[in-house]
Amino acid sequence: MTELQLNPFSNPLFEAVQMSRIFPDGKTFVDCRPKQSYEKILEAFHTENKKPGFDLKQFVLNHFDLPVPHSVHYRSDTTKPVAANIESLWDVLTRKPDKENGSLIPLPFPYVVPGGRFGEIYYWDSYFTMLGLKTSGRYDMIENMIGNFSYLIDQLGYIPNGNRTYFIGRSQPPFYAQMIKLLADKKG
């Protein structure tokens, strides 16, 4: 990854978008996927934002794909017990392996996110998710998620808070060994 890919949020475009509040929250823009390289987008911004009638939101829509919610149509079934609802959520909250694009650091295996809005895995949240997966007998997914954390260790030297470039500067309490133990208890 280039320096700009690792930290695409230290530039005039990012500052303009976040300060203008064209999106309802600060997460939307940082999770957008660029349609071309950051360098080309910043070059276009530098040229276009000086023109009369420049529309920042339209510029962003022209140069980025907005994040798409994954589970918009999911509704829990209040007639089912809580455990049955949780079982039905695993597939809703599962994300497929990623391609490198935007702030999302690609992972090689499927993983479970903490909620429908999220497209990224979170470190210590994942341990508690794995406890639920263990109860559901989903050791395949536990193994996938451990594989992803192992991949992050190989790539970065540690496990960041989540697999977004804006999480690279921080981590969470160490749960990797406990994750491995969950799988070792089953597989030996």
Feature roles, as predicted:
Residues M1-G188:
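Acidic, mature catalytic/reactive cores of soluble proteins
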